[in-house]
Amino acid sequence: MKTEHEEQRELVRWFRQTYPGTLIFAIPNGGARSPATASRLKAEGVVKGVPDLFIPAWELWIEMKRVKGGLVSLEQDAMHAYLRSVGYQVMVAKGFEDAKQQIEALRNEVE
C-alpha cells in the first residue's frame, strides 16, 4: 500500500507531464514537528487544514488521502468549507488514480 506522500508525488509527476504550462504546488502543512518548529511555522502563517496541493490557474485545491484509511480531519473539513465559500474548488482524492480521474473529469467539464 502506497503512502499519501507516494500517491501525491505520483500525481504531481503526472500532472506536470500532462499539463506542462499549468502550475501545481504543494503546501507542506502536515507532518510531525517539534513544538518549537510548530510554533515558528504557526507564527509564519501556517494554518491547520490547508489542502496538500494547489493549482492557481484552475482555482483548485486538492486534499490527498491514502487509498485505504485516509480520513479528512475536522480542521481540513472546516478549511474546505471556507475555501468553497470564497469561490475555490476543493477536491478530496483517495490516491493518485482517484485524483487523476477527478482532474480529468473537471477538465472535460471546462472544455
Language-model segments: which ranges?
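Catalytic phosphate/metal-binding cores of nucleic-acid and nucleotide-processing enzymes, i.e., regions
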Residues: M1-E111
